[in-house]
């Protein structure tokens, strides 16, 4: 490129660049220390000797020490703060826990006493509130008011019967009779129950002959509820139970009529039914067992009032019903015969029907009902104030067996089976998707169908229910029992073990469309090895529904976490379910944290998950009855010759270290030798054996049980010993003519140890 082609601007720019280069070379190579200031930064220049001197200073030990000291001073506070935080995180939880432990040990007695006072006050307030809610005092006043003003209140009944009177009568004089009957029905207990039992239940008996032996067919083979087995509609009809057309129509017509009348009933009068309490059936010479059950509940801490149900006036004992129960055990006697009238009582004479009548005529609304041979091992009172009772107002417990109810019953009751919704008939590892494709008549478990009750059978040794809420179902269940021998026992059981009321409750609840809780829980079987080598079942252990409610919530959460069907049966037999339960225990073996305060780190502990614990021990054969048991005390293989619930090494873990067999018999000794010691009438009329003989027999058996007991506290009574002075048992005179009045065998005996 020639210079002529460069523009003046290019020449000027080149000159400036050349000048800057020359200037920089001059400055950087200068041998004098100068400071050159130009527009922009300030440049410091020096010769090489001074630069080397500064470098030497930086390398010196003195400089390094000085610099280190400066850094330490600057960072000292920061380092101390960091160390303090680390130590606090590492050591504080342990220090706090140590202080907690020291304080707990130092003040534990004071804390316990303070808590005891608070709990006592709180519980007293709760009991007061419960009675306030039950309107017990109010109901008594209403009852008194109604009786006092009976004549004045007759017009109130007029409106209820005018329409009926208009249809049934043509003359005015009959109206007074109608008013009198209506008034009696609403204001006299006996007339009220007579109306329900006679006018509705007895008057609607099927108008046909009972089923013949041929029509009843054959008995089916019972199945344990933990075994997965298809019991199909085809199998159930295979019993060959048949009902000819005319007889079937009569059964259905009577059933329709009684259901219609029951559904139209108003709520029961509050002066007849109110409050919370416990009802124990002691009829049929079961007073010894019943008093043991009641005394045991008091020893467990129960404070609810108790009603002891007796069948007849002949079972009434003045000392028991007027002194022992009201003055020491907060209870009273209720005689069924007096409540319903002799006419109705004599007609309804089957024992399980009378058991239901006893529940009906008791005065409580919210009831914990127990057989005389059923003993609680915990306080039962708050069953009425917790789930699942609050949601359903009816708690039922499972028996050992599955239902074998005939499909013909559901046709009589007009209950139509729906689609497959449950899976009791198949193993837990089977596919439900495949199950629902099976033939419903021959390949599907019948009670897995919608609209039908669960396949789980019911054990009615204990029930918890609201009578006001479930009166209609209880009356229908009584109707089934009244007509059981002729029709319904064969329709509902078809060979299933057990008898009586247990399989009549749930069908009645379904017909009336009333809510209830019946959950599949493990039923524990206790017994002994008989001399012939066979295992003899004596006792059923029923679990606490308060635990079961939470257990099933946990179980379903576990199944959901594994993406499994939440209907799987946790108590089904088989290896798959056993492995699944082990996984469930691992799933629940989690860390629980103490409550944290401020910045306190959590202290952890490991908790092993526990399945629902036992609440009731239903000792159905032999019963804990000091009178009956003492009659065979000298027999070689009698009740008092062995442990009936099992050897200590087999039951200690299940019963959580408490020897309940020894505890129960200790209480039965208190009943026989102290509680009814003043009742010469009882010993003469009912016992058939002297009190001294009974006490000696029970005492010897207690000493026998103490030899291998694992429970040193078993014979110590706390609450019962505070109820009054102990009296020495006296041998009353025995009327030999009455010695055989109570020599019948156990009426509550069941096949294979199934409870009634």
UniProtKB/Swiss-Prot annotation:
Tagged with keyword Transmembrane: yes
Pathway annotation: Protein modification; protein glycosylation
Broadest EC class assigned to this enzyme: transferase
GO cellular component, one term: Golgi membrane
Primary site of residence: Golgi
Cell compartments where the protein resides: Golgi apparatus membrane
KW Transmembrane helix (keyword) present: yes
Key words, A-Z: Golgi apparatus, Membrane, Signal-anchor, Transferase, Transmembrane, Transmembrane helix
Residue ranges, compositional bias (Polar residues): 723-734
Protein role: Alpha-1,2-mannosyltransferase required for cell wall integrity. Responsible for addition of the first alpha-1,2-linked mannose to form the branches on the mannan backbone of oligosaccharides. Addition of alpha-1,2-mannose is required for stabilization of the alpha-1,6-mannose backbone and hence regulates mannan fibril length; and is important for both immune recognition and virulence.
Family label: Belongs to the MNN1/MNT family.
Protein name, entry field: Alpha-1,2-mannosyltransferase MNN26
